[in-house]
């Protein structure tokens, strides 16, 4: 009895180790939410930020996470005061009286 072995070697690659990359944190959706001259209601968020890149002006409150929000219904006003960016809300009644 004669045995015949047909040995075939195929290309192969050993599995590599896992990488340590490939993760990222979720975006925090920071930034300006209402633009200059835009009508806002009291309580609307104007700016979401880390730190005070924008400072609260008239009729604008600052939350615990430095979020700026409107305290009154009116129109948003962005301005520079003493080298600081300041966000204010001009009440709707004042805008009507000025026109």
Curated annotation (Swiss-Prot):
SUPFAM superfamilies: Ribosomal L27 protein-like (SSF110324). GO terms for molecular function: structural constituent of ribosome. GO terms for cellular component: cytosolic large ribosomal subunit. Keywords: Ribonucleoprotein, Ribosomal protein. One of its GO terms (biological process) is translation. The keyword Transcription does not apply. Residues 1-10 form a propeptide. The N-terminus is cleaved by ribosomal processing cysteine protease Prp. Pfam families: Ribosomal_L27 (PF01016). Belongs to the bacterial ribosomal protein bL27 family. This is Large ribosomal subunit protein bL27. It comes from Caldicellulosiruptor saccharolyticus (strain ATCC 43494 / DSM 8903 / Tp8T 6331).
